[in-house]
Amino acid sequence: VSPQTETLRARYAAAGLTQDAVARDPFAQFRQWLEQACAADLWEPNAMVLATAAWPESAGAAAADPDQLAAAAAPSQRSVLMKGFDARGFVFFTNHGSRKARQMARNAAVSALFPWYALHRQVLVEGVVERVDAVESRDYFHSRPRDAQLGAWASRQSEALASRRDLESRMARTTARFDGAEVPLPEFWGGYRIRPHRIEFWQGRTHRLHDRILYTRDAVAAGAGDGDARAGDGDVHAGDGDAGAGDGDAHAGDGDAGAGDGVGDARAGDDGFDAAGAWKISRLYP
């Protein structure tokens, strides 16, 4: 018997979220919530649902044909693991030949959702994605367990696979290929950074009167550089464990999201902008 979904209803009783109480910097606010998600022992608190969509080469023709538009430009989603963040954005890693990477190559606009259901919270990030530099990709790749490094070489992500046996055979050949040697960073694998212009924090409340606090990036202030809104000193990275989410292109860790220094308890100014003028804070109707 299927569940009666129309009657499934949760009770929300969490404390509120106000403009006066949140950090002026969304990355500092995110750090606080991530630490609380880790402390609550949520499963893979750094997992996020990444949404991407390509745009057809012939936009006019596709728009005239709904089926073609759906096939060429429909958004797709998958769970990936956020492996670090700082004032520049949120970093994840994947195969450059994967479906999401191909879509991002044609349309850099993405969104990511952190769904912390047990805490009645979610964080929605919208922005533009860019590749991280080779050094950052190499450093992270070599921090992964060796089996995960070999798996990145063995997987032709998003391509059709005849059987599980074929995948295991590729893994065996890859293991033999690098036996006794360091596993190099594949040229087809690396990191991406979401540079957000919009970050929304959602807190469930009673009577469906939920709290929604929105940070929006001011384009002029953002152009002045990345130093005007800091979440702390350095990146925050999840651990290097072996529990994969979604496509399996990134691996969760120990829940070891370390807090950086310098996160103050600053408040937004009367005009809604933070002191550097980079982020505007506003409240949305639920």
Label each residue range with its predicted role.
Residues 1-220, 228, 233, 269-286:
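Binding-site signature for planar aromatic cofactors or substrates
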Residues 220-270:
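Long, intrinsically disordered low-complexity tandem-repeat regions enriched in serine/threonine/proline
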